[in-house]
Amino acid sequence: MVEGRFQLVAPYEPQGDQPQAIAKLVDGLRRGVKHQTLLGATGTGKTFTISNVIAQVNKPTLVIAHNKTLAGQLYSELKEFFPHNAVEYFVSYYDYYQPEAYVPQTDTYIEKDAKINDEIDKLRHSATSALFERRDVIIVASVSCIYGLGSPEEYRELVVSLRVGMEIERNALLRRLVDIQYDRNDIDFRGTFRVRGDVVEIFPASRDEHCIRVEFFGDEIERIREVDALTGKVLGEREHVAIFPASHFVTREEKMRLAIQNIEQELEERLAELRAQGKLLEAQRLEQRTRYDLEMMREMGFCSGIENYSRHLALRPPGSTPYTLLDYFPDDFLIIVDESHVTLPQLRGMYNGDRARKQVLVDHGFRLPSALDNRPLTFEEFEQKINQIIYVSATPGPYELEHSPGVVEQIIRPTGLLDPTIDVRPTKGQIDDLIGEIRERVERNERTLVTTLTKKMAEDLTDYLKEAGIKVAYLHSEIKTLERIEIIRDLRLGKYDVLVGINLLREGLDIPEVSLVAILDADKEGFLRSERSLIQTIGRAARNANGHVIMYADTITKSMEIAIQETKRRRAIQEEYNRKHGIVPRTVKKEIRDVIRATYAAEETEMYEAKPAAAMTKQEREELIRTLEAEMKEAAKALDFERAAQLRDIIFELKAEG
């Protein structure tokens, strides 16, 4: 394994609160503190702080985000900060996933249906192989990193290691490649190899642009070259190369034979059990399905849904902890949990949701009981895998605060921007008061966000504001991705002055033009009016120098009090720092990116409005889908995963409408 060092490349030095936050976190890690929390206010440069920490402690790092979009953003940022190190991306490789399920009430079996994204599968292989080759590795993952993977020992042992001068029969190499689930195929794809006389060309599972050309002289490897898969151009000579398995669920032949025996034994026991309960249909179904899978495993070495037999393949006892990405890391690794107030509850909930669905399949003869052991980690198992962990959030939850000896604060923004001022006003006459405030913002060419508690109120308020002559849009959960991006962009361009919504905490709403956030029914305790939600909502006005928040309420709840006091405390710290250093807060300047060039542009609104998707012919729609798919692939290649994900959602919508 290469002992690489992290090299942070950035055009600026840590500023404001960042140097002290970095020093405290690094000191904690060096002293062996297990849990630490970074309380970083919105827009204080938390990613840059964490990058500095990673560079200084020099440990393999796993960064966990709560969805693919955020993971994509973090991956792009970290790749820019660490261009000379291995920054990898590990998220669920399904573009679309319908898990296997059974609905007993209607006797409906839903087969597993999935569309695997080849690009993401490649990146997953690249991530696991990097962990075996070097130490300067950062893997950005979604919560899917706690789902079961194959055994890391098995994965490591089955690596095919080739050196110049090594004695190995050509056919023996081909057999070893087939053992690790490579296919022989003359058309070049990841996870395949092709043979031309004494030359074997291998296309590793972790990349599709390069292939490894192994040249034999008799039974000896004469030379190894890295070749451009497309042009055939030689990119370099290699003395040694390691070919990693094409699947994370690989097993040696003798282990597979043992696993098949154990599966057969479990099948016999389960069939006897079902028949004794008079469940003859379930028994017949289970026998038919399992025998087919066993036949495939004997003949091909794998079967569809092989992960359901992962406990047997790894020869693990019932109920034991499954292997996950965390087991591929060395023991001294570091975990960073981004937006921990959302990510930790997600990690906690994964096991129960998965278990409930699989239990129904087992009860009705679709799967053996051992399938229950192909599962995500429980939260307790996740805790046991932690070596050292840093939770990052603007509003850490009770778990993080309880487990961290002290919270490291990062309150000051490099831009000098302050947390917004807050007013609490009575609900009587609130709408007329709000209209007056909105008009003030319109005159200054600033925007307003209004959050309500119910859908009905949001709709009524939108209609009322429209009647009052205000340019307003309503953002709700049923709005499709394409429209959502378009509405946010139009708000920034000034087509709308106000955005009304229920949940303003979703990503994509950090808009520098917003100087006023109005919170209606602020005194109604609940999920969207808890102290954490209120602080996050207040943060939506923190990117503008005139940021202000109005809470309409008749009483001040405990959550409101905590949120107001916390915001005031942060603002006082920020003001003091600005005064000391002579900093004048300036609104963030953020370019208005044209997210989907092919579908609309502000400059050509007439053309776009003339052809909404519903009015397109089948041919025009197909042409648009082709263009968008090409753009999506380009965006993925350029590592702009946020844009690629948005384009993917739009393509789904267009296909659904067609």
From Swiss-Prot:
Function in brief: The UvrABC repair system catalyzes the recognition and processing of DNA lesions. A damage recognition complex composed of 2 UvrA and 2 UvrB subunits scans DNA for abnormalities. Upon binding of the UvrA(2)B(2) complex to a putative damaged site, the DNA wraps around one UvrB monomer. DNA wrap is dependent on ATP binding by UvrB and probably causes local melting of the DNA helix, facilitating insertion of UvrB beta-hairpin between the DNA strands. Then UvrB probes one DNA strand for the presence of a lesion.
Name of the featured protein: UvrABC system protein B
Biological process, per Gene Ontology: nucleotide-excision repair; SOS response
Domain Helicase ATP-binding: 27-414
Database matches in Pfam families: Helicase_C, ResIII, UVR, UvrB, UvrB_inter
Cofactor stoichiometry and binding remark: Binds 1 Mg(2+) ion per subunit.
Gene (UniProt): uvrB
Family assignment from sequence similarity: Belongs to the UvrB family.
Subcellular location: Cytoplasm
Domain notes: The beta-hairpin motif is involved in DNA binding.
Originating species: Bacillus caldotenax
